[in-house]
Amino acid sequence: DYYASRGLGDVYKRQDKEFMLQSPTAQHLYHDYAADMPICDYHCHIPPREIYENRRFENIAQVWLGGRNPDGSYFGDHYKWRVMRSNGVPEEYITGDKPDRERFQKFAEALPMAIGNPMYHWTNLELHVFFGYDGVLNGDTAEEVWNLCNDKLQHDPKLTVRGLIEQSNVAFIGTTDDPIDDLYWHKKIKEDSTIKFTVAPSFRPDKAININKPGFAEYMGKLAAAVGKEKLACINCVTSALTDRIEFFAEMGCRASDHGLDYIPYREATKEEVNAIYQKVMAGETCTPEEAEKYQTYILIHLGKQYHRLGIVMQFHYNCLRGVNRKMNTLLGPDTGYDMINTATCGGEIAALLSALNDTDECPKTIIYSLNPGDDAQIGTILGCFQNSEIPGKIQHGSAWWFNDHKIGMEEQMSRLASLGLLGNFVGMLTDSRSFLSYTLSLIHI
């Protein structure tokens, strides 16, 4: 009723202070407490190079729809790409080489079909907050919006990358980084005294854990090079190399790790067994699923102990099936919009992994996210089994993630947490974003 009683343009106008705040309690909590608090975006996919270089985008399509990297891989907001594909837009306008103006037109024409999808509000709010546009984007308004946004992007000092971050009152950004990354751009950011917010790397060792996926042996060669070795000849060499890289990340300000797993495994094995499995795969043979789980469990326990030692938070993102469209995944590569919710049941394995770390008092602070909302209650009950006096809320139920990152999904996640744990100790939301415009909600009510 709140939105039906107003034109959508009016909903986004700056004077509408109560957008999304539909009760006196919500208004009180936001305006009197939350509105002026800084944002700590502890998990995102924003490229640190663009922060250091203070990139100025040429047009709104570059910001929203991305493009192709020099190495041929693709970058951009796959949420928007999925909207376009669902509206029948040919791929050449999405990740292809069509002119940016034409790509933007196709997105604008698709957006009105997205009522009920958070993309609709996200897009129009970004136009309102950062560009002062109080209309709504569609095929008819695309030219007007294109010209307005591009003029501001090219000339407004507040619309460089750093300008967007600063005006959004962002205090902390946690990027997502591979263990082999030299963190060059993080070093440059740390050395630049004009950057007032903190940008910290996060340790994402998926490629060193996924022994059963293509490219593992090649990646281990790169990990060896990162620690000054010709090769990693044994499992001790692997754990030593990972420890070396974790310590380097910690020196660079790393506060968190992140693990993107199909499911969380737990299968015990001796060091000798795991070494044999590693040697087998490095020799070009294929390991069984059970062998992969033994290796993964061994590495995860080792990493968990290092995180605890160094005060790094361990994050698990699981229950996602990635690249399920084989043809398009082969053509475009990962993280291009062909992933789905999985239904793996691994609550017992999560508990066993935490218990193994807890046995030696080396369980780190942990945040657990599942892409399947059906796991929320199970996660909520796992938390209470491993809390202790080290810190309130040591084990966290991660915020609604990815396909659950909308009003219904966030309410359901917080309701589960509140009913099974302590909502007051929740670490809160993050952007998980690849876009510098994703801090919109911090400015809606200013």
Predicted feature descriptions by range:
Residues 49, 315-319, 367-371, 397-400, ...:
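Short acidic/histidine-rich active-site segments
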Residues 179, 205-207, 261-263, 320-324, ...:
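Active-site-proximal loop/turn and secondary-structure-junction residues that shape catalytic pockets
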Residues 43-47, 317, 445:
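Histidine-centered divalent metal-coordination motifs
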Residues 40-42, 174-175, 199-205, 257-259, ...:
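Hydrophobic faces of well-ordered beta-strands that scaffold small-molecule active sites
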Residues 10-99:
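An N-terminal structural lobe/cap that precedes and organizes the functional/catalytic core
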Residues 28-31, 153-166, 182-198, 218-365, ...:
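Histidine/acidic residue-rich metal-binding segments in metalloenzymes
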